[in-house]
Every structure is written in structure tokens, then in C-alpha cells.
Swiss-Prot record:
The lineage of its organism: Bacteria, Bacillati, Actinomycetota, Actinomycetes, Mycobacteriales. Gene3D superfamilies: 3.30.70.330. One of its GO terms (biological process) is translation. This is Large ribosomal subunit protein uL23. One of the early assembly proteins it binds 23S rRNA. One of the proteins that surrounds the polypeptide exit tunnel on the outside of the ribosome. Forms the main docking site for trigger factor binding to the ribosome. The gene is rplW. It holds the Pfam family Ribosomal_L23. Part of the 50S ribosomal subunit. Contacts protein L29, and trigger factor when it is bound to the ribosome. It comes from Corynebacterium jeikeium (strain K411). One of its GO terms (molecular function) is structural constituent of ribosome. Coiled coil: none annotated. Keywords: Ribonucleoprotein, Ribosomal protein, RNA-binding, rRNA-binding.
Amino acid sequence: MSTVADPRDIIIAPVVSEKSYGLMEQNVYTFLVHPSSNKTQIKIAVEQIFGVKVASVNTVNREGKRKRTRTGYGQRKATKRAMVTLVAGSDPIDIFGGATA
């Protein structure tokens, strides 16, 4: 991706899972991101979209699973996740529009 990409093209969606809810208490937020984006682009995108300061970004590339279907085998698409840590003392991100778990 180029450096002038729209931040909303980089951050696809928040990850909704038990683990991501637990990490939110430690100011760590998990997002699905575009597979070709790098950590610098992710950091800039989160800061622009949510108006917060990011301390660090960790990324995980997840391979798509091979799944069996009625007609043979298929493949789930590979995804990339980013765990974004905010600076200590910063305001929390209101991702889901309500109280967190």
C-alpha cells in the first residue's frame, strides 16, 4: 500500500473475541488490517481515526484454514491482525459504542 492510503482502507474492523476484550483493559486493541499494510501505516491510521497516541503495534499474519465442503476442499482467506498498544494514561477507544466487558 502507498503511504497516502486512506486510513479506513488500512483498518478493516475490530476483532471481537474473548481475548481481545481482556486486552482492552490493558489499553491493547486488536484490529483486522489490510494484509499489505505495515506497522507504521497501522499506527498512523489508528492515530488519525481515533485521535489517540499509539505506543506500539504488534502484527500477526494468520493463514487461511483449509475447509472441507460438499464439493471438495475450500480455503478461508488469510488475515492480518494488529494489536495496538496505547500510551499509558490515554483515553480508551470506544470501538463498540457502549460499555466494555
